[in-house]
């Protein structure tokens, strides 16, 4: 298992990036930018996107920038949102959806909050069900930095691939000859510009 990613057998799972975390998570702006870039790129690649919101009465709705992806000309029909109470995204409802609609799914790009709770438990469930899991380390975090670092180690011990936003996008792109190269390059430049602005 070396962690190759193909747009034909991959989905993006975005876990619980909800409004209640806006004031409690450090560097939340960068995390949202990275997730938005991944979302826009996956729409261009026609990679399915599955999002969850955990107990939205308590944690609020998905943050505004991730509720849509206006920079992409691709159809938003590729985006599904599930409500959940369990920590793991991989609920019976979601598992059934994947079985019926994504029969070729082999690998999952996983992001979101919090890394040591919902993201970790999602990763373990996906691994247990035979999927390769690629956790994007700059698109997930926890309120407590110590828990974030610990969770990455824990997931790696179980066989999760740890990677970054830009790395995984280029891994899918593979070549400048890809028909989506120009659009993806624009999205990458846009992301870097936005991150540089918030870090000034």
UniProtKB/Swiss-Prot annotation:
It comes from the Eukaryota. It holds the Pfam family Isochorismatase. Belongs to the isochorismatase family. PANTHER family: HYDROLASE (PTHR14119), ISOCHORISMATASE FAMILY PROTEIN 2A-RELATED (PTHR14119:SF12). This is Isochorismatase family protein 2A. It comes from Dictyostelium discoideum.
């Amino acid at each position: 298992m070396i962690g190759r990613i193909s747009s034909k057998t991959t989905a993006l799972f975005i876990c619980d990036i909800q409004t209640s975390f806006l004031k409690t998570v450090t560097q939340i702006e960068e995390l949202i930018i990275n997730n938005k870039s991944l979302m826009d790129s996956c729409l261009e690649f026609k990679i399915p996107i599955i999002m969850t919101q955990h107990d939205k009465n308590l944690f609020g709705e998905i943050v505004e920038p991730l509720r849509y992806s206006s920079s992409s000309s691709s159809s938003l029909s590729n985006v599904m949102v599930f409500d959940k109470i369990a920590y793991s995204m991989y609920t019976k409802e979601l598992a059934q959806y994947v079985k019926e609609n994504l029969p070729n799914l082999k690998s999952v790009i996983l992001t979101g909050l919090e890394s040591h709770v919902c993201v970790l438990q999602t990763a373990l469930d996906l691994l247990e069900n035979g999927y390769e899991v690629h956790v994007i380390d700059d698109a997930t975090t926890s309120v407590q930095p110590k828990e974030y670092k610990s969770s990455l180690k824990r997931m790696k011990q179980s066989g999760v691939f740890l990677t970054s936003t830009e790395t995984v996008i280029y891994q899918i792109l593979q070549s400048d000859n890809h028909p989506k190269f120009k659009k993806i390059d624009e999205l990458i430049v846009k992301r870097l510009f936005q991150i540089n602005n918030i870090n000034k």
